[in-house]
Each structure stands twice: as C-alpha cells, then as structure tokens.
Amino acid sequence: MKKRTTVLPGLLLAALATLPLQAATVRIVQTNSAGDSVMLIDPATNTVVGEIKEIEVNHGAAVAPDGSRFYITNEAESTLDIADAKTLKITKHIPLTNHPNNIAVSKDGKRVYVAIVGGPGAVDVIDAASMTRAKSIRTEGGIHNVYVTPDGRFVVAGSIIGKKINVIDQAKEEIVWTLATEEGVRPMAFDVNPDGATKRIFAQLSGFNGFVIVDFAKQQVVDKIKLPELPPAERVTQGLQGSPSHGLAIAPDGKTLCVLSKMNTRVYMYSLPELKLLGESKVGHHPDWLTFTPDSKRVYVANAGSNSVSVVDVAGRKEIAQIPVGQVPKRNITAVLP
C-alpha cells in the first residue's frame, strides 16, 4: 500500500491529533538555509531519518495534500524545486519571477503560493497539475512569508520593505485588502472563530521583540504585546537581522500560542484565546521558526545560530532535546504519513 504524506497547518493538524498514534507516522521537515539539504526528523526518536539533497540555500518547505511531492524554495537559483516524497529526489525546477522566501499550498492542493521577496515583490502562483507558473500577483514590497488561512479562503502575504499585510482572495487570486504596519511584516499565525473563519492575525514586526494582533474582520491592529524583557547581559543583540522576535505558531488544539525571541533565546507560551503568558523555555541560539506535533505536546524550534532543532515539552515548558541538523536551519513544517 502506497504511503501518503500530508502537511499539517492549522485545523488539519488539529483533526489529525485525534487519530490513534499507530495510524500515522509523523515527520518534522527542516530546511537548512545556508546548506544544500532539507532534513526529515522522526519525533519518536528525535533523529534525522531522511534528507532531500542538492537544493542550495533552501528556504521554505511545504507538502502536497496528496503526499506525492515536497515543494521547496531554492534561493540560489530562484526556483521552486519539487521533490518526490517517496524517493526524496528532485524531479522539477520551476523558474520564479525573482528571489523566493516561504511557501503555502491551497487546501485542495491545486495551487502553490510562493513569496517573492526580490523587488518589486509578488506572490507567484504555481499550477500544481502542470507544474508551471500560472500568474504573479504584484504586491507593494517584497514578500517574506505567505500563508493560506485555516479556512482556505484567503492567501495572506507579509512584506518587510513594504511594511504591509496583503490579503488575497484565494478563489479570485486578487488582493482584496491591505493593512499598513509600523514596521516590516515577519512571521504570522492565524486564530479562528468557532465556524473556522479567521478571527485574528498574530504578526511579528521588524525591530519589535513581540507581536501585534490584527482583527481580521475590522482589518486593523487592535493590540501589541511585548515579550518579557531580560537584563542587558542576557540579551542577544548581534545577528538578529532586524527581527528580535521571529517565529510563532498556534498549537493544533488551539489552546496555545508559542512565540520565539531571538533576542531572549526563548520560546514563550501564551494561552488562547486569553493571551495570558503561561511560561517560557530556553532554546538554542537565534531561534527562527517552530512547528508543533499533531498532539500539541511538543514544539520543534529551528535554532539558526546553533545549527540545531530544540524539542520543547509544551506543558512542562522545558527543552528536552536538541537535534543537530544542517547549516542555519530556519523554516520547518510537520508532515504525517498515514
């Protein structure tokens, strides 16, 4: 019987969290932005068990809903590279309009959205069936990260230089509203209403050690939360690349928001929907991205400055392992083999 790989954003992660453990094999897919390989980690053993090679300066990663392929952005060649999910071999290089960053996939798997950070900025739309670029949606400023909202209705793209959140109607593939921000937009996460519609965007901004809260219906910033301040001697101030706080994610059960601080070398846990600070865990140097296991019990933190991935027990708020990976690990995702 052929195995199938599924990427786990938002509500899909929550649904799979209810499956019996024996029904699925979980993998953490870890990019290495200064290397030429993407590594697959088995969270049962916390060891690297697979590797996609020959993608120099890989950045974003995603998996097709049918499990047939991995999508990985190649910064060195400005391409979207496709790897066979079974053999882990590269099968296709799709030329992009400019230098890419992160990736998102539509819920039906028919479209792949690529953040184009190179000027003037865009979201490239890839037709998954033909494996060609179907169109490019122009934005104001290069796009750092792109997401599909949990309900699949919108594509949300954040610009660092443009200092703007661009919201795209997924069906029309047109920008329907934008929101100017105080600083450049870094990672985002999406809180939902009981009906699954997007309620809030949590967004990190350049130069701010914390995150802002955007009311999706009102299309405006309604609050700003600063992370705890450490004594000067404990802060990291070098190599932050303009983002003292980079990386945040909501647990599949919807109860916890985890937020990274490169300046503090910590992951902070907030309750949802109240946003009460529950605690923190120290991790490796320059934590940059994170992803949850389907049961919401652990979070895997990519430490760009330590060339490692920290495994954090969410309830215990404690690092329980640190896994050596490649050079400058950043984006990571959770995938499941049913």
Model-assigned labels for residue ranges:
Residues 9-20:
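Bacterial N-terminal signal peptides
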Residues 1-11:
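Bacterial N-terminal signal peptides that target proteins for export
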